[in-house]
Amino acid sequence: MNAHAQACAVTSAASPDGVLRERGQREVFCGLTGIVWLHRKIQDAFFLVVGSRTCAHLIQSAAGVMIFAEPRFATAIMEERDLAGLVDANDELDRIVTQLLARRPEIKLLFLVGSCPSEVIKLDLSRAALRLSQRFSPGVRVLNYSGSGIETTFTQGEDACLASLVPVLPAADRSARPSLLVVGALADVVEDQFKRTFAALGIDQVAFLPPRRSSELPAIGPETRVLLAQPFLGDTARALEERGCRRIAAPFPLGGEGTALWLAAAADAFGVSHAHVERTIAPLKARAERALARYRAQLAGKRVFLFPDSQIEIPLARFLSREIGMELVEVGTPYLHRDHLASELALLPGGTQLSEGQDVERQLDRCRDARPDLVVCGLGLANPLEAEGLTTKWSIELIFTPIQGFEQAGDLAELFARPLLRQTRLAV
C-alpha cells in the first residue's frame, strides 16, 4: 500500500458543477493488484513483475494461491546491486525470462509488468519486451505495461494491461460485419451469461477483451462497436478508438437496471428493436428484482459513504440509491471520466455530493461527522474506522467478486448487507 503525501499545499475546492476536487494525501493499492484477477482470466498468459520483495509479497498475499498450485505470475526481484547499477538489469531480465519460458512451455503471452522500483531506475521495459518478443517469436509474444503505484489507483493496472494488448489486436477485414467487443475482465460465468443474452438479442458477432486465451485476440476495425464492462478503462477505450472502433455510451452492468440499460444500448447500436429487447430480458430482469427484494428490506434508508478507491464508485452509488434505496452521503472517486460516466451521472439523485481525487484526512473528517451506516473504503482505512464504531465494506472485494449482470444482482446487494448483518449480530 502506498501513502502519498504531497509537498505542495493541500487543496480542496468545489468546481462549478458541484464536484469537490481534492488534491492531498492519498492511500491506494498499486496497479499490480490487477494481476490477481487478470492471471486467472488469460489462461496461457504469464505476468512477470519487475520489482522489489514488497511487490512479491503484495501479489502473493492478495492472490491467496494454494501452495500446490502453479500460479501464472512471479516477481523478478530487483536487488541492491540492480538499483546501484552494478549489474546490467537487462541481462538479468533476459536470463530470468529464458529460464521461465524453458520451465513453462505453455506460456504464449508474457507481460513484463513495471513497478515503482523499475520506474525509479528508468528500466525500459518496452524495449525489453520488443527484444524478447523478437527472440522468442513466434511461440511467445512479450508485452509490457506499468503496474506502478506512482500516481495511480489499483484498477489502472487492468486498464494498462488491456491497453498494451490493443496494438497487437489483428485488423478486421474491410468487408467484416459489424461486431461487438465487450471490454473489461469479467468472470467466466458472467461472460457466458452475457454471450447467451447477446445471442438471444440477435447479436452474434461478440468478442471479449481480455480473451480467455491469447490465440483468441479479437479482430477490430471501423465496424467494431466497443461496450465497456468496467468504468476504469479510459486508456484502453482511447486506444481502441484510435484504431477506428466506436464506443457505445451506456451505464455499467451493475444491478438489474444497469444491466438492462447496458444491454439495451448495445442492442440499439445493432438495430435491435426495443420490443425484442424487453421480451428477451424481462425474465432475467424479474429474477434480479426478486433477488434484490430481500436485501432492499435490510438496506433501504441506510446511509452510505464511498471513499475514492476503485473507480467503480459512481455506478455502485447509482445501484445502491435507485435499486436498494440507500441514501448517498458522499460518493468519492479517484478520477471522474465524465464522458464514460455520463449515463451514470444522469441517474444519480439530484444534489448527490461527488468528490474527485483524494485528501484522505479531510474525507475522514467528513465521514466521522456524518456517521454513516456503512462506509465503502480501501483496506487501509477499514480497520481504523471499524475501531471508531463505523461499519465498513472493502472496496477491493467489489472488484474480485463477480457482480455484473442480472444473475449477480443479488450477490452485489448481499456484499453491502453482510457487514451490517455482522454488526447487528455482534451487538447482541
Swiss-Prot record:
This is Light-independent protochlorophyllide reductase subunit N. [4Fe-4S] cluster binds at residues 30, 55, 116. Binds 1 [4Fe-4S] cluster per heterodimer. The cluster is bound at the heterodimer interface by residues from both subunits. Its cofactor is [4Fe-4S] cluster. Its EC number is 1.3.7.7. One of its GO terms (biological process) is photosynthesis, dark reaction. Protochlorophyllide reductase is composed of three subunits; BchL, BchN and BchB. Forms a heterotetramer of two BchB and two BchN subunits. Component of the dark-operative protochlorophyllide reductase (DPOR) that uses Mg-ATP and reduced ferredoxin to reduce ring D of protochlorophyllide (Pchlide) to form chlorophyllide a (Chlide). This reaction is light-independent. The NB-protein (BchN-BchB) is the catalytic component of the complex. It catalyses: chlorophyllide a + oxidized 2[4Fe-4S]-[ferredoxin] + 2 ADP + 2 phosphate = protochlorophyllide a + reduced 2[4Fe-4S]-[ferredoxin] + 2 ATP + 2 H2O. One of its GO terms (molecular function) is oxidoreductase activity, acting on the CH-CH group of donors, iron-sulfur protein as acceptor. The keyword Lyase does not apply. It is an enzyme of class 1 (oxidoreductase). Pathway: Porphyrin-containing compound metabolism; bacteriochlorophyll biosynthesis (light-independent). Keywords: 4Fe-4S, ATP-binding, Bacteriochlorophyll biosynthesis, Chlorophyll biosynthesis, Iron, Iron-sulfur, Metal-binding, Nucleotide-binding, Oxidoreductase, Photosynthesis. Belongs to the BchN/ChlN family.
